[in-house]
Swiss-Prot record:
CDD domains given in the database record: FtsY
Organism: Mycobacterium tuberculosis (strain ATCC 25618 / H37Rv)
Example of a GO cellular component annotation carried by this entry: cytoplasm
Function noted in UniProt: Involved in targeting and insertion of nascent membrane proteins into the cytoplasmic membrane. Acts as a receptor for the complex formed by the signal recognition particle (SRP) and the ribosome-nascent chain (RNC). Most of the substrate proteins are involved in stress regulation, lipid metabolism, intermediary metabolism, and cell wall processes. Shows GTPase activity. Can also hydrolyze ATP, UTP and CTP.
Effect on the protein of changing residue 236 to A: Severely affects the affinity toward GTP and causes a significant decrease in enzyme activity
Protein name listed in UniProt: Signal recognition particle receptor FtsY
Compositionally biased tracts (Polar residues): 50-66
UniProt-recorded Gene Ontology molecular function terms: ATP hydrolysis activity; GTP binding; GTPase activity; signal recognition particle binding
Compartments (UniProt record): Cell membrane; Cytoplasm
Region (Disordered): 39-86
Binding residue positions for GTP: 230-237, 312-316, 374-377
Alphabetical keyword list: Cell membrane, Cytoplasm, GTP-binding, Hydrolase, Membrane, Nucleotide-binding, Receptor
Temperature sensitivity of activity: Optimum temperature is 25-37 degrees Celsius.
């Protein structure tokens, strides 16, 4: 019995000694002081190898507005019952003001031009309005050459009749020479024969083979450019508007240049025509440089892909050298942007000899390519057409027959002569 007790005591004592040794060793290690310096902790490179020269740019994060917080008072929170307690105050119903519906603004209405009157109707009006010319030219000549053989006094009467009708010396001499040759053949026996001969001679004098087309077709890189010149009071601006109406009706995109900057009424008139026919218009302040406005009009025509640019120039007297030089400047400046295809001279058919003096000066300055005779319905003569072509060497391309939008007609020699003879 005692032997077992001693063994148990020895085992317990051994365990106590082992535990004491272990505890002492742990305490010893914790209290040991190291005399070597502790290594410094380095900064860990987390750049991924990118440097300032690696092409990456840095930008500031855009500031975002915080989302508007919703008022959750009275609403169940997380963990609350799904139903509102009976003792909770009831939420009132409030009227919420909603913004009124605003309809989208309608696009401005594009004015639609009235349908162009057919050319046949215009030629009939030409015949009727030139009826007064028969006394001076048509009936007078028919009465002379339809009576049979003519002596020298009769031929002098024929010549005087032509001069009174404003044909001018050159055209008169040419017509008399042709009539003498045709009547000398002896084939003219009746008044109808005389009328047929006179008709052929007058048509031939108007040179029906001349090109009377308006050069208004666009080029590959820019629109065609038409310059309209003339003195004040000839209907120049009205002619530009009427021509624009015809071009727009033909499907052309037209830009009007209001280069008549000396009269505000001229630019306003052209603006009205543009709105009426559906064309664009370029204008400057009153007194602006006409050449600059003309240049801007061509520039806009090119940018907008227009087909035609019509430039209305300031009316000027042919005796004013400074104003004529300015007209030359307008053409030169426009030519820097695009070539000028047509220079139309607008003449008043009622002014006779003075109109030819104007035409000669304009032809020398801007090299006109065609003439437009306005107010042809107001003349009792009509011979100015022959004289313009004879002395200027350019065709009469258009004739104005009144103030109506369709009273601008293409000039056709045969129809004009028929209107003269009735």
């Amino acid at each position: 019995m005692w032997e077992g007790l001693w063994i148990a005591t020895a085992v317990i004592a051994a365990l106590v000694v082992i535990a004491a040794l272990t505890l002492g060793l742990v305490l010893y290690r914790r209290r040991r002081i190291s005399l070597s310096p502790r290594p410094e902790r380095g900064v860990v490179d987390r750049s991924g190898g990118y440097t300032a020269s690696s092409g990456i740019t840095f930008s500031q994060t855009p500031t975002t507005q915080p989302a508007e917080r919703i008022d959750t008072s009275g609403l169940p929170a997380v963990g609350d019952d799904a139903t509102v307690p009976r003792d909770a105050p009831k939420r009132t119903i409030a009227d919420v003001h909603l913004p009124e519906f605003e309809p989208e603004p309608q696009a401005p209405e594009v004015p639609e031009a009235d349908a162009i009157a057919p050319p046949e109707g215009r030629l009939e009006r030409l015949r009727g309005r030139l009826a007064r010319s028969q006394n001076a030219l048509g009936r007078g000549l028919l009465g002379l050459i339809g009576g049979g053989d003519l002596d020298e006094d009769s031929w002098q009467d024929v010549e005087d009749t032509l001069l009174v009708a404003d044909l001018g010396p050159a055209a008169t001499a040419s017509v008399v020479s042709q009539l003498r040759s045709r009547l000398a053949s002896g084939n003219v026996r009746t008044e109808a024969d005389a009328r047929a001969v006179l008709r052929d001679v007058l048509i031939n004098e108007l040179q029906p083979g001349m090109d009377r087309s308006i050069r208004a077709l666009p080029h590959a890189g820019h629109p065609s450019v038409l310059l309209v010149v003339g003195v004040n009071g000839t209907g120049k601006t009205t002619t530009v508007g009427k021509l624009a109406r015809v071009l727009v009706a033909d499907g052309r995109r037209v830009v009007l240049g209001a280069a008549d900057t000396f009269r505000a009424a001229a630019a306003d008139q052209l603006q009205t025509w543009a709105a009426r026919v559906g064309a664009a218009v370029v204008r400057g302040p009153e007194g602006a440089d006409p050449a600059s406005v003309a240049f801007d009009a061509v520039d806009k025509g090119i940018a907008a892909g227009a087909d035609v640019v019509l430039i209305d120039t300031a009316g000027r007297l042919h005796t004013k050298v400074g104003l004529m030089d300015e007209l030359d400047k307008v053409k030169r400046v426009v030519t820097r942007r695009a070539s000028v295809d047509e220079v139309l001279l607008v003449l008043d058919a009622t002014i006779g000899q003075n109109g030819l003096a104007q035409a000669r000066v304009f032809a020398e300055v801007v090299d006109i390519s065609g003439a437009v005779l306005t107010k042809l319905d107001g003349t009792a003569k009509g011979g100015i057409v022959f004289r313009v072509q004879q002395e200027l060497g350019v065709p009469v391309k258009l004739v104005g027959l009144g103030e109506g939008p369709d009273d601008l007609a293409p000039f056709e020699p045969a129809a004009f002569v028929d209107a003269l003879l009735g």
